[in-house]
Amino acid sequence: MVITLPKLKYALNALSPHISEETLNFHYNKHHAGYVNKLNTLIKDTPFAEKSLLDIVKESSGAIFNNAAQIWNHTFYWDSMGPDCGGEPHGEIKEKIQEDFGSFNNFKEQFSNILCGHFGSGWGWLALNNNNKLVILQTHDAGNPIKDNTGIPILTCDIWEHAYYIDYRNDRASYVKAWWNLVNWNFANENLKKAMQK
């Protein structure tokens, strides 16, 4: 099974001015595509060549895991954002955030602090844990909650420097602030609904 680069659901300029077309082009067509190409090279003629991307993420380690997880994480990241998104949450995710964090503002502040305070490259996640509570998680490098079995991902934000350096240089806080204007709450609601049924 050849792993392919998932198609973006919006144009490369659709997230501007918060994330520029230049950033999205490099991030998607160079970084994300690079992980796909590298993974296909690594798994050729191995048992992983017949497995799905998700199974590779769960079962692999080392370079194969790093590339597989980065493919999965980036696809989830693109879907966590969208044009004409952002603002306050709605529907079940709004109610669940209020239940587990007290208010959306509390959640937003806590999540932003995790994203800005994370040392080095990684990811920030909103996930549903085994106790059906929303939690904020941070993973290093290619890590994700699926591999760590720490929760079911609901949303993610990429905090590798390549996600923001063209637009914001070393100012991660400004990137995080801009990211809130792109959060796809419909995607979060879909993920929460599926997670609650498991």
Curated annotation (Swiss-Prot):
Cofactor: Fe cation
MF term (GO), any: metal ion binding
EC number annotated for this UniProt entry: 1.15.1.1
Keyword tags: Cytoplasm, Iron, Metal-binding, Oxidoreductase
Enzyme class: oxidoreductase
Cofactor binding, per record: Binds 1 Fe cation per subunit.
CC terms in the record's Gene Ontology section: cytosol
Family annotation (InterPro entries): Mn/Fe_SOD (IPR001189), Mn/Fe_SOD_BS (IPR019833), Mn/Fe_SOD_C (IPR019832), Mn/Fe_SOD_N (IPR019831), Mn/Fe_SOD_N_sf (IPR036324), SOD_C_sf (IPR036314)
Major subcellular site: cytoplasm
Database matches in PROSITE patterns: SOD_MN
Catalytic activity as recorded in UniProt: 2 superoxide + 2 H(+) = H2O2 + O2
Compartments where found: Cytoplasm
One BP annotation, GO: response to oxidative stress
Residues that bind Fe cation: 27, 74, 158, 162
Xref: Gene3D superfamilies: Fe,Mn superoxide dismutase (SOD) domain (1.10.287.990), Iron/manganese superoxide dismutase, C-terminal domain (3.55.40.20)
Record's subunit section: Homodimer.
Role this protein plays: Destroys superoxide anion radicals which are normally produced within the cells and which are toxic to biological systems.
Family the entry assigns: Belongs to the iron/manganese superoxide dismutase family.
Protein name, per record: Superoxide dismutase [Fe]
